[in-house]
Amino acid sequence: MKIFTALLSLALFLALTSVAFAAPADRVDLKRVTKSRAAVVDYWTAERMRNAIPAERAQGGSSSKAQRAAFSSYEYPGSYTTFPASTHGKVFFTLGGVNYVCSGTAVNSSNRSVVWTAGHCVNEGPGAYATNWAFVPAYRDGSRPFGTWTARTLVTSSAWANQGNISYDVAGAVMNTHGGSALTDVVGGRGIAFNYNRNQFFTSFGYPAAPPFTGQRLWVCESNLLTSDPTTSPQTMGIGCDMTGGSSGGGWVVGSSVYTVNSYGYSNQRNVMYGPYQGSVAQSVYNAASTR
C-alpha cells in the first residue's frame, strides 16, 4: 500500500490498490473557486496554518522490490526570499472539513499565475476538490514574506480526479493577483519540463511536516533516478529522499525546471520518494492552467 505525503482517504486507497487505468481522452479536470480571495486569506490564521496536518501514513508493504536509497538531504541553507528559493512555498487547503498542508512551486506560464503541485493536493482522487486553497511562497517559521496567495482555479488530470490514477498525480493551481501583481512577477518562476529523458539528477524541494520534521523549513533532497514503480502505468519515478508528509507537491528540479513533484512512497521502501513522469497528460494540465 502506498504512503501519500498529503491527504489519504478510503477512496484513495481503493484507487491505488486497483489495476492501473489508461489516461482518458478528456485529459483535464478543473474547478473554479467561488470563495473570495479575502475570505480565504482571513481563514488562514497563523493558528490554522500551524495546526494544519501533513500526511496520514498507510501501513503495509508494496509489490515493488525494496531499494537502498543513496541521496543527500538537508535544510535549504540560503535566503528563502531570493530567487529561485522564492518560487518554493507551502500549500494550505481544506478537504472534508480538515485543514492540510502540501508544497508547491511557482512556474513560468503565460498568465504568470501557476503553482505546480500534486493532484492529491487539489483533489481527493477521485472525489471532491479542496477549498481554502492558498500558497505561501518562501514560508519559514510562520512568516509570509510575500503574503498569502489564493487560488482562482484548480486544475488536475481527469485520470487523477476521476480515477485516482497515481501516474497522473499532478496539478496546477491558478493564483489570484495579490496587491495588483501576478505571482511570478513577484517571486519569479521555475521552468517546467515534459516528455524528457528519465535518467536525471534530481533536486527535490518540499516542506515535510510529519516527524522528525516540523513543516516550518524548506527541505532539499538530491538524488539520481533510483528506481521506477512497476505497479504503475506509465511508471512513476523514484529517488532517494527522506521527506515526510507535507512535502507532497514539492518540485523535483533539473537545471532550473520542474520535472515532477513529490507524490508518494511505500512503507517497505524507506527513504524512497516517487513522482509521476510528466508526459503529454501533465503538459495538458499545465496548458489548461496557464490559460485560466
Regions found by a protein language model. Name each.
Residues A151, I166-G240:
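Chymotrypsin/trypsin-fold serine protease catalytic domain
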Residues T81-R140, E222-T232, G240, S263, ...:
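Catalytic histidine site
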Residues L8-T17:
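Bacterial N-terminal signal peptides
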Residues A22-N108:
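Protease-domain processing segments flanking chymotrypsin-fold serine proteases, especially trypsin-like
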Residues F71-N99, V107-N108, A128, N132-A182:
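Conserved catalytic-core segment of clan PA serine endopeptidases
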Residues G265-R292:
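C-terminal cap/linker of serine protease catalytic domains
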Residues D242-V261:
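Catalytic nucleophile loop of clan PA
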Residues M1-L8:
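Positively charged n-region of N-terminal signal peptides that target proteins for export
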